[in-house]
């Protein structure tokens, strides 16, 4: 990654910044999808074997994922060359762990959830870019609600309520839809606050945020659409 790439302050510069971010999001989602495909088809027997005989591999990967999110975010904000490789490694590992979730659903359900996620992502991105309303308050509310969802999800691990799981998924869709819009507005604010002097590190940081929004939106919609799978 070139640490010295600078985007000039202008509509063209802002568009270039957005293009850079969305190309990174596309790379991340594409890499995750590719790894998930490998696990679900060529290596399906290995996936099932891990689920049945070695579930700690999955949990270990999930823990490493969590660590990589913080490492990638920190590296990106410091504009270090390691930020992009870490982001891509995280995306690949996330594809691995996602396959253990996706395997429980019908193929049509997965495609339906993915296409719906893409449509929501596109619509909310436009809203975030075009709206004149300050969404910083909404952003704080969404993060507060997200904490509540995490707590409720942990509680439901012990309760095992199907209805509670459904409600959590619906609320999660609303939360991540709001975050997609606010993150897109944040991209504009970061660009404007730095007078257009933003390097690749910020592009990776914002791409990571949008990637996480999309993946979590996809998982939430997958659970909603796949209730009967």
Curated annotation (Swiss-Prot):
<feature type="transmembrane region" description="Helical">
    <location>
        <begin position="162"/>
        <end position="182"/>
    </location>
</feature>
<feature type="transmembrane region" description="Helical">
    <location>
        <begin position="83"/>
        <end position="103"/>
    </location>
</feature>
<keyword id="KW-0812">Transmembrane</keyword>
<feature type="transmembrane region" description="Helical">
    <location>
        <begin position="109"/>
        <end position="129"/>
    </location>
</feature>
<feature type="transmembrane region" description="Helical">
    <location>
        <begin position="56"/>
        <end position="76"/>
    </location>
</feature>
<protein>
    <recommendedName>
        <fullName>Uncharacterized membrane protein SPy_0358/M5005_Spy0301</fullName>
    </recommendedName>
</protein>
<keyword id="KW-0472">Membrane</keyword>
<keyword id="KW-1003">Cell membrane</keyword>
<feature type="transmembrane region" description="Helical">
    <location>
        <begin position="141"/>
        <end position="161"/>
    </location>
</feature>
<feature type="transmembrane region" description="Helical">
    <location>
        <begin position="21"/>
        <end position="41"/>
    </location>
</feature>
<comment type="similarity">
    <text>Belongs to the BI1 family.</text>
</comment>
<dbReference type="GO" id="GO:0005886">
    <property type="term" value="C:plasma membrane"/>
</dbReference>
<dbReference type="Pfam" id="PF01027">
    <property type="entry name" value="Bax1-I"/>
</dbReference>
<dbReference type="InterPro" id="IPR006214">
    <property type="entry name" value="Bax_inhibitor_1-related"/>
</dbReference>
<keyword id="KW-1133">Transmembrane helix</keyword>
<feature type="transmembrane region" description="Helical">
    <location>
        <begin position="202"/>
        <end position="222"/>
    </location>
</feature>
């Amino acid at each position: 990654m070139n640490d010295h790439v600078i985007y000039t302050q202008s509509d063209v510069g802002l568009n270039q910044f957005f293009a850079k971010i969305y190309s990174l999001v596309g790379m991340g989602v594409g890499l995750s999808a590719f790894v998930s495909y490998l696990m679900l088809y060529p290596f399906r027997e290995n996936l099932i074997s891990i689920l049945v005989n070695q579930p700690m591999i999955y949990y270990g990967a999930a823990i490493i994922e969590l660590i990589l999110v913080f490492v990638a975010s920190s590296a990106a904000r410091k504009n270090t060359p390691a930020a992009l490789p870490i982001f891509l490694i995280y995306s690949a590992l996330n594809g691995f762990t996602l396959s253990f979730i996706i395997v429980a659903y019908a193929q049509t359900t997965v495609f339906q959830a993915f296409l719906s996620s893409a449509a929501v992502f596109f619509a909310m991105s436009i809203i975030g870019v075009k709206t004149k309303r300050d969404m910083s308050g909404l952003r704080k509310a969404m993060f507060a609600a997200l904490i509540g969802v995490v707590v409720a999800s942990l509680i439901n691990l012990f309760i095992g309520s199907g209805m509670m799981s459904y409600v959590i998924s619906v609320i999660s869709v609303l939360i991540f839809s709001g975050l997609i819009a606010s993150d897109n507005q944040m991209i504009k604010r970061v660009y404007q606050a730095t007078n257009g002097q933003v390097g690749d590190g910020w592009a990776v940081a914002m791409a990571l945020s949008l990637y996480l929004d999309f993946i979590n939106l996809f998982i939430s919609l997958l659970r909603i659409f796949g209730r009967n799978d």
